Amino acid sequence: MIASYLGTVFGSASAPAFARSPGRALRPALALAALALLAGCASAPKTVPLDTSITAQGQNSRVRYIMLHYTAGDTARSLKVLSQGQVSSHYLITDDRVPKAYRLVDETRNAWHAGDGSWYGQSWLNTSSIGIEIVNMGPIGTQWQPYSDAQVSLLIRLIREIAARHDVKPQHIIGHSDASPQRKTDPGPAFPWQKLAQAGIGRWYDVNTVAQFSASLAQTGLPDVLWFQRELARVGYAVPQHGQLDRATINVLAAFQMHYRPARYDGQPDIETAAILSALE
């Protein structure tokens, strides 16, 4: 192709000089100019050359939260939904005997896992969180599927690494239901938050402090609903502040109880829930 192009520009070597038109005398110069232009384009860098030898101190990670979910489906279905649909997560932990951790979205990019929710007043949590899905069916009738010890062990390792990379605070390691208590229940009451806390991951309470608050509340009586609403907001939850035990407040109380008192999560104010709220920092 190049040879035929040059032949067209320069003409045939056997053609007599008197047969050429005057305009043909310019063609060699034009061809050389075209070749020079092509050479220049070929050598131009495809991206802007950057000097990365200096790094600014004034920066931090975009990641502030780690959010945990259950998939409500098996591994094959979960992988398909999370990789081919309009929902995704950064990581997926399987339920194999020896669980596997898939990275589906790079931590530098947003995964679509959080949806509508809020934590400590911040919404649009997809932009500031790492999402981890765990293969688990969630509720099965009136029961909840437990998480295997192997899953939890792998999850602890994964969260520890992510939290260290991004300096994620303990109170910002949450469940989907913590950020979206009006519409979500995952990772559910079967999720072992206390076991994670014993491994140094997430926020938990001191049992002796809870016992002291419980004894005090037994004497003074149960606080009113507005007290519960204010305390729930203090520890991160989006909850109404009108002093009424409405459905929205019940849902937030139930989400809190699933996380910190999973033995009973009826969404009703009680002394133990009040004591745990008081003990949390």
Protein language model features and the residues they cover:
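Active-site-adjacent loop/helix surface patches within enzyme catalytic domains
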Residues: 44-59, 64-169
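Bacterial N-terminal signal peptides that target proteins for export
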Residues: 2-30
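Second-shell loop/turn segments in exported
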Residues: 79, 118-119, 138-150, 180-183, ...
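Acidic, His- and aromatic-enriched active-site or binding-groove loops in soluble protein domains
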Residues: 58, 92, 189-212
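Short acidic, glycine/serine/threonine-rich helix-capping segments at coil-helix boundaries
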Residues: 216-280
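Structured segments of extracytoplasmic/periplasmic soluble domains
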Residues: 82, 94, 107, 135, ...
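Acidic/histidine-rich, metal-coordinating catalytic segments
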Residues: 168-183
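C-terminal motif of bacterial Sec signal peptides marking the signal peptidase cleavage site
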Residues: 39-40
